[in-house]
Amino acid sequence: MVTQHDEYRSLYQSYLKCCNEHDLDGMASFYTSTIKVNDVPMDPPAVTAQFEPLISAFPDWHWEMRHIVVDGDYIACHFTVTGTHRGAFQGVEATGRRVTISEFTLYHVEDGKFAEVWDLADMDAAMRQIGLGEDRHGDGSR
């Protein structure tokens, strides 16, 4: 017998596969018609559009699930996220540096789709790893 826990775990693994393949249409298919992201209502295309600059700058961006907890209609995940900085990102030109960050996400599932998501990704660590704040010119300037 398949439990709700097993069903939600499988749902999330299917979603994560789309994420790691950078399949934005596939990702959007897992969202309700209006999904709240960090309490802000959005439509699926607006959610997936947020991934475009990230994937453009880090074409090998990859989420590795470290932990998953299912509690009722909620899925909590802890990830290690990696990628190589191959394109401009938030004003920093490509460095070729590899980044590794932590991410924590909580999903609320309704009718087999994600209706709400709260996400905390350590993007400050990614920015430090690609050199934001470093003296890149050797003269004290940034």
Question: What is the predicted function of each stretch?
Answer:
Residues M1-R142:
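C-terminal and inter-domain tail/linker signature
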